[in-house]
Amino acid sequence: EIGNIPDRICRALAASAGLPSGTPGPVHINCEFRDPLVPEDSQSESACEAVEGKRRAGVSVYPMHFLRDPLSENILDPERATVVIAGQGAEEAVLEWAARSRVPVFAEPMVCGVPEDVRIPFQQTLLDDEEITGLFEQIIVTGRPTLSRPVQAVCASGKRVVVVASYGEWPDLHGSASCVVPSLQESDCVDEARQLPLLEALRERVKEVRAGIEERIASYGDTPSALGVMDIVWQLCPRIFLGASNPVRIADLIAHRHENASGPTQVWSNRGLAGIDGNTSTALGWASACARLEGADYSAVTAVMGDLTFLHDASGLGLPRGEEFPPLRVIVLDDSGGSIFESLEHGRTAPVEMYERYFGVSQRADISALGAAYGVKTRTISSLTQLREILTSPVEGLEILHLPISRPTKDIAHLRSL
């Protein structure tokens, strides 16, 4: 408990000083003191020494406008092989710095524009491999990489963590950050002699995983599967919305499996406690905003979500009279209920009947009839060939593509174990 004290109060103290945003704010800290409230003089020194010996050093937070002398201070430890872990909201300047410095980047699927030379795909698989995580000792975090457990585990593994964030609520779920800076400077450098072997080792591992993914997708032939559908969407669709359940995690497992392929230009997914709430409405709102801003140059949004996610916000399909749907395709991966918990402790330990009742909750809804009730064109897709043909044709208004599939639980477990 004593060791957690710096992590608990560090954010509050940083906010009171305006770090790293530059805007100080009021802070309220609730503290409870143990009896005796005033220790005897003879106890003071030993008590302080006990706390000092047990506590973990607090994080150093640098203000936004703090100018570091490039000759005297390097935030990074150049003696440590370094990687970047980029989550949703990653700062472009950090990705550009990584490309210049030959620092590998593990990125969530919502992070687009990572330079090909340093992008390392399949982060869930690679960062769950101790041989891989043993190759580097320093992590630079940008954005909010909270999608998968392997990423969080490596950030909490005792490696040196540098967070780049210009806002007060910087990402550091485990209190493991060594320092927080609003940006990286040219003086922040790493040792290229350490980085190049790391980059090459990661690329070799990526080749192995890529082959395993290709084999797994090919095993389904032309039959739609969660992996096969996501693979096609990633190849063909420039703007993708991912449902906040299995789809975003499957994208994290297979995105960029095609070497030297550019992939989508924009990817979005709702994050945080909202879960599957409002995914259909969010996709429609994003598509509508993009269509209004871009006009004739609009690149349609393709949304991919599970059946429960779709049904949970089905009323989002409602549209007032006199308004038109934006060009949007909603791909519904119908695996008869919720399957994300099958790959977690719930599915591994609960009896099948209990799991299906409380987590699977397969619905009796007719998705085609539901779409028709809202005046939305709905098609049931039975092959990947058919899906590919549709995705390469123009979309007019809102369209629902209903794909019955098997649950991807075993596929997800297989890809994570490659």
Residue ranges, per PLM feature:
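Glycine-rich beta-alpha junction loops
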Residues: 31-37, 88-90, 110, 168, ...
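Glycine-rich, anion-gripping cofactor-binding loops and their flanking helix/strand elements
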Residues: 70-73, 82-173, 257-297, 311-318, ...
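Short glycine-rich phosphate-binding loop at a beta-alpha junction
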Residues: 28-30, 83, 139, 238-243
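Active-site diphosphate/adenylate-binding microenvironment
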Residues: 203-298
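Thiamine diphosphate
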Residues: 255-418
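Terminal amphipathic helices with adjacent charged low-complexity linkers/tails
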Residues: 28-59, 161-200
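Glycine/aspartate-rich loop-and-adjacent alpha/beta segment that forms the canonical ThDP
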Residues: 21-69, 387-418
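Short acidic-hydrophobic, aromatic-tinged amphipathic segments that line or gate anion-handling sites
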Residues: 1, 119-128, 164, 176-195, ...
